[in-house]
Amino acid sequence: MKINEHSLPVIGAILGDIVGSRFELKGTRIKTVEFDFFNIDSHYTDDTVLTLAIAKWLLEPNNNLIDIVLSLGRQYIDVGFGHSFKNWLRSPTPQPYNSYGNGSAMRVSAIGSTASTISEVMSLAKESAIITHNHEEGIKGAQAVATAIFLAYNSFPKVCIKEYIEENFDYNLNRSISDIRNNYNFDSSCQGSVPEAIIAFLESTDVEDSIRLAVSGSTPFSLIYSVKSSIKYRELNVCNTSYEGMM
């Protein structure tokens, strides 16, 4: 069966969610890349449900985003949603609750492969976040992840992605996963986990390696981009010129 390449970042995000699911709880986190990729405890979580909700919204732009999220979220309400999000799902008139948790960044993979420009990425990511995560850090995290995926999907080399994210989102990406393993405490905020997830992606050699690095660093999720394997990276010295056509 041929898979539409637009869906590959979504598949990668779901894969990362399933693999990382058994390491989310305190006491289950590890500091090594040597672990079984799947076992009997591996499962999809709320992040998969919301990733699919955003993808559905992008495919059906005439439908209301909140209605789509409520429909899928209520159908799968017991797959790991946090307390505040469950309250949002159960409310007859759901309102954003000023969250800066990384849930806003976990659900945006489809935006990165659907948008045509960085401006569109920023707009769609904000729109997807503010239904719940209307704190500036919650919006920023969603936009940063969606932008990183967009740039990767459009064949930008990692050095350009790192440069763009640092300059436009003020994230410190000048660390290694080894540093993070030694010093990082689990943090579910956007500002405390999105940079670490992007670092795992930047250090990785492929999708599996990215997931293993993210898990070993105890980052709450793995930023996965999964695009056609025959990607042709641009020369390293044309980052700024290349961005101009993508704005």
What role is predicted for each listed range?
Residues M1-M247:
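Structured, active/binding-site neighborhoods that engage oxygen-rich ligands
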